[in-house]
Amino acid sequence: VLSKLRFRWEHLPLVQDFDCGDEPWEREIANYLKSEAADGALTQSEERGNGAWLYFNEDRALVGYAVIGLTNWRWPDPKTKKQYPHAVAIGVDRRFSGQPPGPREGRYSWQIVTDLMAEVLKYPDVGSVLTLFVHESNARAIAFYRNLQFEFVPGLNYVDRTTASTYLAMAVKLP
């Protein structure tokens, strides 16, 4: 079972060796933790579920992190903008990918995302939906989120102007 810590500037040395992998989107997630997540953790209000968390295993090793904020999407009604909790970034260090062995519900990645879902439910004023974007060629992540009942949100995908990568919009309705 993972423990979590709200990310603060003093935790920056803990994340310097964080490594999600070699794919461009994996490097992007690791770099986000080392730069923008720290900035966001200090500048975003902690109200309404905003924040960044570090997740540690029983050996106190940094396993992963997650950042949640709010976003405005024209969904489900394309004529109306609505604010939703948004998983800005979720990362698991490559050393802990697929760990621990056993059922997927016990894996670190699963624990992190279900913890984010629980965070969202603490703030009913922002709704009971969690949104995110996933790289279009990251089939493993897409399957993972589909197993957690995330669905594709048509018309909200975006193309990163710097990398020309396409990211698919996904959302899950929480109980």
Report each predicted region and the residues it spans.
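Non-catalytic substrate-recognition and accessory regions of acyl/acetyltransferase enzymes
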Residues: 1-103, 111-131, 135-175
